[in-house]
Every structure is written in C-alpha cells, then in structure tokens.
C-alpha cells in the first residue's frame, strides 16, 4: 500500500490506479473493493475513487456499521459513520452490488484464491472500536500464502481464533500499522511469516510489536513509508519484494 500523506491522498490513489492499472482506453476496472472497517485511514476517500468516471468497481465487500455498536471514544473523536456513509452512498450511486456478510467467503482475483475472515458484523456484549471488526484477507497462489490483516487487534481473542484457522503463511501485512494492541505471540506463532510488511514508518512502529515480530517470526521487515512503497510479486518459486514503486 502506498504511503499517502494527508489531504489529497484520494487523488494519489486515483493517479496510481490510472497510471498502473488502466486498459488501452485509459479505464480501470476493479473486480471488487474491500472496506476492512469504518476508519477514515482505511475507507475514507473511497467515495472519490469509486465516483471517478474512469474507474469501474464490479462489487464491494463492506460490513454494516452502526454507532450503537461502537465505544464512546470513537463516536466522539472519529468520523466512522461519516466515512461509512460516504463509501456506501458512492457505491449505491453507481449501482455497485454491496456484500455485507462474507465470513469465510471465497473468491478469486486473477490467479489468486481469496478467503475472507471476520467478515460478519460482530455482536459483542461490550461496545468496541472498529479495529476489532477489521476484515482479514488470505491470498493464495503458486503454493504461497499471504495475510492482509487490516487493523485487527487482540480484543475478544480475534487474533488467536483467526490465525488458528489460517495456519502458516509466507507473508504478513502487519495489522494496525504496527501500533500497540496487535500482533500477539499466538497470532505470530500460528502464522509464522517469512516476510512482514508494515504500512508505516519504522520509527512509528510500537516497540513491543517490533520486539514480537523479531522474536516470533524472524522475518524480513519492510516499512512502506521508508521504502517509498512496497510491491510483493508472487512467482512459482518465491515472493519477490520490490521497493521504491511510487
């Protein structure tokens, strides 16, 4: 994922897609988009991308959001309901089908086999933040496996439950930008990745998370901001990591 800085990052995303993914007519078709959870740094600006006349989205995976299920801190400080409403409205304006419950659902993207975890809205006794509800995506191709962990955290035992279902992988997109309350020992031991990708600067990664990554995986670590973007190329015999792609 590119390191997108501040206001105007929607334009950076659109420009990147149009530069790298457009067909001979200058148009981009996305088989699907995934809204991992209703936080502005994950789905904010999605409405601008969806509304772009040169970009077509075939379907969207987006769980329902309600302030009724969200803790007071997030309701007062963040704009979860706003960014969710903007994304959903943009999808509806272009008649894009929205899949709201997709726990365990499987699909494909080119040669990739994709499985979704945490794909249904959780009903917890206590109100929680959106990170607890973050969608996790497993990708498989050429015998290689990668997990995109969104912002999943360890509340309610989510990391332990999901990683037990997934098992070992080759690459992990580290959850929650490497901040605290993610990447438990159980999660890392179950997944045992050889490559860790963190969408952040190295200096911003929480010390406890970096310690656990080194202790329990010993993997190569790539921080997207320091690398000016990271691309993982899945080949029959290896995963080739490319940097400086922006």
Which residues does each PLM region occupy?
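Active-site environment of divalent metal-dependent phosphoester hydrolases
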Residues: 38-44, 66-70, 105-108, 153-157, ...
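Stable alpha-helical elements in mature extracytoplasmic
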Residues: 9-13, 26, 42-45, 80-87, ...
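Core dinuclear metal-dependent hydrolase active-site scaffold
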Residues: 1-29, 92-168, 228-246
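Active-site metal-binding motif and surrounding structural segment of the metallo-beta-lactamase
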Residues: 3-62, 162-179, 192-197
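Extended active-site neighborhood of metal-dependent phosphoesterases/phosphodiesterases
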Residues: 60-117
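Metal-dependent catalytic neighborhoods of phosphoester/phosphodiester hydrolases
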Residues: 43-55, 69-81, 184-188, 207-211
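Hydrophobic/aromatic beta-strand patches that form the interior of the parallel beta-sheet core
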Residues: 34, 61, 99, 115-117, ...
